[in-house]
């Protein structure tokens, strides 16, 4: 018995079969994949962090 995993495209929300039949997974198409890449490149998306590092955070490359 083969279970088929289906996910939603992160760009448009269409259902996408997670397998060899969907070469752009988790995206439904090359278009949605490129839209997502463009959002990352334009810094519209970011990975959350605990805070920004600055020169005053008591660290240095010099020892």
UniProtKB/Swiss-Prot annotation:
It comes from the Bacteria. It comes from Salmonella arizonae (strain ATCC BAA-731 / CDC346-86 / RSK2980). The keyword Metal-binding applies. Keywords: Metal-binding, Zinc. PANTHER family: DNA GYRASE INHIBITOR YACG. InterPro entries: DNA_gyrase_inhibitor_YacG (IPR005584), Znf_NHR/GATA (IPR013088). Binds 1 zinc ion. GO terms for biological process: regulation of DNA-templated transcription. Inhibits all the catalytic activities of DNA gyrase by preventing its interaction with DNA. Acts by binding directly to the C-terminal domain of GyrB, which probably disrupts DNA binding by the gyrase. The gene is yacG. Pfam families: YacG (PF03884). Zn(2+) binds at residues 9, 12, 28, 32. This is DNA gyrase inhibitor YacG. Belongs to the DNA gyrase inhibitor YacG family. GO terms for molecular function: DNA topoisomerase type II (double strand cut, ATP-hydrolyzing) inhibitor activity; zinc ion binding. Interacts with GyrB. Its cofactor is Zn(2+). SUPFAM superfamilies: Glucocorticoid receptor-like (DNA-binding domain).
